[in-house]
Amino acid sequence: MPALMVVGCTSHAGKSLITAAICRLLRRQGWRVAPFKGQNMALNAYVTASGGEIGYAQAFQAWAAGVEPTIEMNPILLKPQGDMTSQVVLKGRAVGRTLAERYYQDYFEVGWEAICEALEQLQADYDWIVCEGAGSPAEINLKHRDLTNLRVAKHLQAPTLLLVDIDRGGSFAHLIGTLELLDPDERSLIRGFVFNKFRGRRELLQSGLDWLEERTGIPVLGVIPWIDRAFPSEDSLDLMERRRRKTQAEVTIAVIRLPRIANFTDFDPLESEPSVQVRYVGLQDELGYPDAVILPGSKTTISDLLDLQRSGLAQAIRDYAAAGGTVLGICGGFQMMGQHILDLEGTEGIEGQFEGLHLFPTQTWFTAEKTLRQRQTTARSPQAGLPITGYEIHQGQTRLDSDSEEFLPIFDDPKLGLCDRNGNLWGTYLHGIFDNGAWRRAWLNSLRHRRGLKALPTSIGHYQAQRDDLIDALADAVEPYLNLSPLLTAL
């Protein structure tokens, strides 16, 4: 069946977004398209309808293709936990932790088998597969055990686009160097070059493009301009670049940039609000006095909690809350807000009982069992009756110490989260909570009320519609500058 692959000379070349754009462009032509990434290393994850865990980037690409995300689209997900260890998620399920030096010894064979099984299923279900590589396909020390780049392209005999980030400089050297390091059978799969993130006029680049085509015999199929839109990021390093100030912002929200922050795509809907300035605060930064503080999810909640305490930021958050500030915790952040976290089995690698922030009268117990599921519920606060969707990804269960009337469930299912009666403290296990437009606006209005600001309308839809518009804008921005015709005609 037809398949394309996108690989990059480096990490952060833009592979994920270009893959998403191609998925949307093929969908517009009437094809049923599946994205695929054999192995992804990321802390942003999504739970499929079947209860499996995949990288959020592959879920985003599936939405670009207009299909439901499935575990076959990302059969191996590695979730870094620090100290050169990662949790291994195989076919949607966590199967253990591994050291980097042990991973390929323990998982290479079973991983390649999972990749082949996933591709076979996708070939049966879809017209096209658009594959994304990882990092660079030319890492000499890793090529013999690379599961996700040109091994996949060779398996599918997929024509491959080699993508380079021209904004970094050295793009011609990157392209030529990558080609030189590929084996002949790998090099034969490279059918086109794509320059990404170009700022300037193409005619100033043309002499270099002509030289490249003459030198390699491979056509340049795209020179894609810099796209100045806020698309989902896979790497927390990208958060450091999100410093754009909104002149019309009336509310400021500080998201704590934990060392192992996870699922920070939760905040894309907040960043889409023109009146909201989202500021990512590192452990060495001043908290200040924003309108709200959010403690996000974490892949290693205990380690991040200890780092938060050592930095002094934990005390700053407690002082902020004591002064009447609003604090919201999601998943690991919710767990941190309690009295204690107990990990008696060393699920995260550190055994013991650990002091939380003492903002909620809750205790959290970690167990080896991981909760993975999509959820539908109804809100009780800040506005009752709102339909809510989201998903859970967590290890551990949280219990309220007492039947205190000071704390109320946020949703019909009280296990999903709680808040205090004053609306200052919020905690939930639900990822994607801000995707629910009416709930997001109701929560923001509680912050605006304290500032004496006019309430925002709450009769808005789910963020899914905005995300789809964003994907359309991405495809519209890419289409004039990416010539897929030679590949599509050949296939």
Curated annotation (Swiss-Prot):
Among Pfam families, the record links this protein to: CbiA (PF01656), GATase_3 (PF07685)
The question of whether Membrane is a record keyword is answered with no
Pathway noted in the entry: Cofactor biosynthesis; adenosylcobalamin biosynthesis
Report whether Ligase shows up as a keyword of the record: no
Keywords for this entry?
Cobalamin biosynthesis, Glutamine amidotransferase
User: Which InterPro entries does the entry mention?
Assistant: Class_I_gatase-like (IPR029062), CobQ/CobB/MinD/ParA_Nub-bd_dom (IPR002586), CobQ_GATase1 (IPR033949), CobQ_N (IPR047045), CobQ_synth (IPR004459), GATase_3 (IPR011698), P-loop_NTPase (IPR027417)
Q: Name one GO molecular function term.
A: ABC-type vitamin B12 transporter activity
Q: Which GO terms describe its biological process?
A: cobalamin biosynthetic process
Active-site feature positions: C331 (nucleophile), H431
Q: Where is the GATase cobBQ-type domain?
A: 250-439
Its family? Answer: Belongs to the CobB/CobQ family. CobQ subfamily.
The role this protein plays is: Catalyzes amidations at positions B, D, E, and G on adenosylcobyrinic A,C-diamide. NH(2) groups are provided by glutamine, and one molecule of ATP is hydrogenolyzed for each amidation.
NCBIfam families xrefs = cobQ (TIGR00313), PRK00784.1 (NF001989)
Would you tell me the protein name for this molecule?
Cobyric acid synthase
Organism of derivation: Synechococcus elongatus (strain ATCC 33912 / PCC 7942 / FACHB-805)
Give the source lineage, highest ranks first: Bacteria, Bacillati, Cyanobacteriota, Cyanophyceae, Synechococcales
